[in-house]
């Protein structure tokens, strides 16, 4: 029996066919791809066969390079396509990541914008509440109101910029508008500077803090919109804080006192030098001001180490000023006394200044003399000078005691015997001013070597010390001779001492007490330094010569007096030369020599004795003048020999040479 196929069997067959078709489709695609590849290979093989055939006809070597080049280019082209596809895939992946990140940032920015709008609204409400005129007592000035109004305007502008409608505005427009508002706010502030008052610092700080806190959330933004918003906030904060600092600076400028400005002007003029101050105060000022000025230290005691080398020079200048003040006071006091009364006999005087110095009271001068010159505290670099000042102080005390004793002794002698003239010599052509005896005694009793000389002047200081010692020795010899003469005068007629007449003018008599006071002054109490030891021996030798000379003079005087008693006057008349027609018992003339025929003023006896007692080697000569030293020593010996063995003509020549040598030494010390 034949069974007919039903509908179910037909449906199953269709389902199987469809499934088979679906399974075979990918296989078909694969087969097609394989077929294509085979076609390409076949094409290549055909091409190769064609080329092989063509190669047979032509040379194989010529086509071989072309085939290699074509195959290489085909490979490169395929590799480039694959690389481009890979790059595009990677770029798409990166863009996708960036797009997702931007979407997240946009959502965050929208949230921040909402928060910023809320904060700006709250700030605006707060500022408006501050500006309300309901409470005038709490208002803090017109300037503060202007600043708060400007802050309100800036916050409103910020709200407008943060709105979504204005999100796409350019940054340049924002900057221009903010700059215009800042200029407008600064203009009324400059117009009202006169009415400004000090604004409390706390209110300005609160304003700046509120503004900065209200815009704080925008600091964390990083994209383009974030930078735009932070720029706006920085503008607001900078304008508020900058304006407050500017106002504070102006207030500080106005608060500066006028005294400080005056001090600044004085400082700009510069400090006045101490020399100019002393010159300005030197005219018509009482002596007390001088004492205060000279007793004040011109240099601070605590100096830097770098200035220690200069401190010694400053102190030496200070000491010179003290010495000059003392000499000026003495000279001026002598001139005042000379105008009031006439002096008995002029002495040697030295004019220190050509201009008139201010008059000074005697009590102030005594205060100046009694003030120790070494009261200034010297630094360590000035230690060599300190000992000299202490020695001078001791010398002043010793001189005061010696002066009192000498005055008492001289008062007794004045009651017994008259004064006797001394050895005289006239050095100057002009008349010298008469000076009171007391002031001159004080001047001559002052040590000549008042200031300690520096190291360069050590040769001269030794000479000065030796001369001081000579004065002391001569003063003692003169006192001895004077006593001998007084004893002889009691027995016979008075006889003058050894004298030398240079001119025919009669010499004025001077009080004996002042002269003895001058010669009895021990001015050589200062010890010589170690550097002067080579010169000391030579001066001691000269000192011995002078002592011997004084003793020989005493012997000659005694012999002369004995001859006078015996009637031997003829030889002495020849020595006298020009003096004739005297009485039966004329005084015995001394040695004399005439140097000049011009009339010259007379000089006191003590100054000439000092001149004759001065050795020709007053200033020590350097090593380059060694050849001339022997000549000077020979002159010195001639001086002594002619003093003992009197010859009028040779004595005159010797004294002339010594006088010239002495003047050359004084004028040209170096």
From Swiss-Prot:
Record keywords, A-Z: Coiled coil, Cytoplasm, Repeat
Localisation: Cytoplasm
Organism: Homo sapiens (Human)
Further comment found in the protein's record: Encoded by one of the numerous copies of NBPF genes clustered in the p36, p12 and q21 region of the chromosome 1.
The keyword Coiled coil appears for this protein: yes
Extent of the signal sequence: none
Record field: compositional bias (Basic residues): 560-578
The protein's name in its UniProt record: NBPF family member NBPF15
Segments forming domain Olduvai: 165-257, 258-329, 330-421, 424-479, 480-572, 573-670
């Amino acid at each position: 029996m034949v069974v007919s196929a039903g509908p179910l069997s037909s449906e199953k067959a269709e389902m199987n066919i469809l499934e088979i078709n679906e399974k075979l489709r990918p296989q078909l695609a694969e087969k097609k791809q394989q077929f294509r590849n085979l076609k390409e290979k076949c094409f290549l093989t055909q091409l190769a066969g064609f080329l092989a055939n063509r190669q047979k006809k032509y040379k194989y070597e010529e086509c071989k390079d072309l085939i290699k080049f074509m195959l290489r280019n085909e490979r490169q082209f395929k590799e480039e396509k694959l690389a481009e596809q890979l790059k595009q895939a990677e770029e798409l992946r990166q863009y996708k990541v960036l797009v997702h990140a931007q979407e997240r940032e946009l959502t965050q920015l929208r949230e921040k914008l909402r928060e910023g709008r809320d904060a700006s609204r709250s700030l605006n409400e707060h500022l408006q509440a501050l500006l309300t005129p309901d409470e005038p007592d709490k208002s803090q000035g017109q300037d503060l109101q202007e600043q708060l109004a400007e802050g309100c305007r800036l916050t409103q502008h910020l709200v407008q910029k943060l709105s979504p409608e204005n999100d796409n505005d350019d940054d340049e427009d924002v900057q221009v508008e903010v700059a215009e508002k800042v200029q407008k706010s600064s203009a009324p502030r400059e117009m009202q500077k006169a009415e400004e008052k000090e604004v409390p610092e706390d209110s300005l700080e609160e304003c700046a803090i509120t503004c900065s806190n209200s815009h704080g959330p925008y600091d964390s933004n990083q994209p383009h919109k974030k930078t735009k918003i932070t720029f706006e906030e920085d503008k607001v904060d900078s304008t508020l804080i900058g304006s407050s600092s500017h106002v504070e600076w102006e207030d500080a400028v106005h608060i500066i006192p006028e005294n400080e400005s005056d001090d600044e002007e004085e400082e700009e003029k510069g400090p006045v030098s101490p020399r100019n101050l002393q010159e300005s105060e030197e005219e018509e000022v009482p002596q007390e001001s001088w004492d205060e000025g000279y007793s004040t230290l011109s240099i601070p005691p605590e100096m830097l180490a770098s200035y220690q080398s200069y401190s010694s020079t400053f102190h030496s200048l200070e000491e010179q000023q003290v010495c000059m003040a003392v000499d000026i006071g003495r000279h001026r006091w002598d001139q005042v006394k000379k105008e009031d009364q006439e002096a008995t006999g002029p002495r040697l005087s030295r004019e220190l200044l050509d201009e008139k110095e201010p008059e000074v009271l005697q009590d102030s001068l005594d205060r100046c003399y009694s003030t120790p010159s070494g009261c200034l505290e010297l630094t360590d670099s000035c230690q060599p000078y300190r000992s000299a000042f202490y020695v001078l102080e001791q010398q002043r005390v010793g001189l005061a005691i010696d002066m009192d004793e000498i005055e008492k002794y001289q008062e007794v002698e004045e009651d017994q015997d008259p004064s006797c003239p001394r050895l005289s010599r006239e050095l100057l052509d002009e008349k010298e001013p008469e000076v009171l005896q007391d002031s001159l005694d004080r001047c001559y009793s002052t040590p000549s070597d008042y200031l300690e000389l520096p190291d360069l002047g050590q040769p001269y200081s030794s000479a000065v010390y030796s001369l001081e010692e000579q004065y002391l020795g001569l003063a003692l010899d003169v006192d001895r001779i004077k006593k001998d003469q007084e004893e002889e005068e009691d027995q016979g007629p008075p006889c003058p001492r050894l004298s030398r007449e240079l001119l025919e003018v009669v010499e004025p008599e001077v009080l004996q007490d002042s002269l003895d006071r001058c010669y009895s002054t021990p001015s050589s109490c200062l010890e010589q330094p170690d550097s002067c030891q080579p010169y000391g021996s030579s001066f001691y030798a000269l000192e011995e010569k002078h002592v011997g000379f004084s003793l020989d003079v005493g012997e000659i005087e005694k012999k002369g007096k004995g001859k006078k008693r015996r009637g031997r006057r003829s030889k002495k008349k020849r020595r006298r030369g020009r003096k004739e027609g005297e009485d039966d018992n004329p005084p015995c003339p001394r040695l004399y020599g005439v140097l000049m025929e011009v009339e010259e003023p007379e000089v006191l006896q003590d100054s000439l004795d000092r001149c004759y007692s001065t050795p020709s080697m007053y200033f020590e000569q350097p090593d380059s003048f060694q050849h001339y030293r022997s000549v000077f020593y020979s002159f010195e010996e001639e001086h002594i020999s002619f003093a003992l063995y009197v010859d009028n003509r040779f004595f005159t020549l010797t004294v002339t040479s010594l006088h010239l040598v002495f003047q050359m030494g004084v004028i040209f010390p170096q």
